[in-house]
């Protein structure tokens, strides 16, 4: 397994607070859909509640504790009800391309025929992405721990 640095991203829409993003590369013998189902189960265990549709009322994004995406799976192109690979919007997202460029800058997107570094260089996204500050990466005490101090 390899992991990128963690990046801090400005919130989209009218959400508040920083978002933290990173990319990991893993090897697995699982089929892509099984891996995706396990990722969704992990989100549920961590407290993520998915709602129908990607956006809440009035077109605003919802805050969430965790969001796991399967960006690529070998060199496969997958289009099923629960899984689209490569991720259909990764080329529009600096918060995906910046950490991914650390791990696989030369990886070619099979549909767009462009490398990760080329997509990142050509991106016109207004959202700022920077390496995360160390204080954002330290575990925070739970409310219970904080109240006993």
Regions found by a protein language model. Give the residues of each.
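A short beta-strand-loop structural module common to alpha/beta enzyme folds
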Residues: 1-8
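Flexible, gly/pro- and Lys/Arg-enriched active-site loops
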Residues: 11-20, 28, 33-36, 40-149
């Amino acid at each position: 397994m390899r992991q990128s640095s963690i990046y801090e991203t400005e919130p989209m829409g009218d959400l508040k607070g920083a978002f933290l993003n990173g990319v990991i590369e893993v090897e697995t013998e699982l089929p892509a859909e099984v891996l995706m189902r396990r990722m969704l189960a992990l989100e549920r265990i961590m407290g993520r509640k998915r709602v129908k549709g990607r956006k809440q009322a009035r077109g605003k994004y919802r805050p969430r504790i965790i969001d796991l995406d399967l960006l690529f799976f070998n060199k496969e192109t997958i289009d099923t009800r629960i899984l689209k690979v490569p991720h259909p919007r990764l080329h529009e997202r600096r918060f995906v391309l910046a950490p991914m460029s650390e791990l696989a800058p030369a990886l070619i997107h099979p549909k767009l025929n462009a490398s990760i570094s080329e997509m990142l260089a050509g991106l016109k996204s207004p959202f700022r992405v920077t390496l995360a500050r160390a204080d954002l990466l330290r575990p925070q005490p739970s409310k219970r721990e904080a109240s006993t101090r």
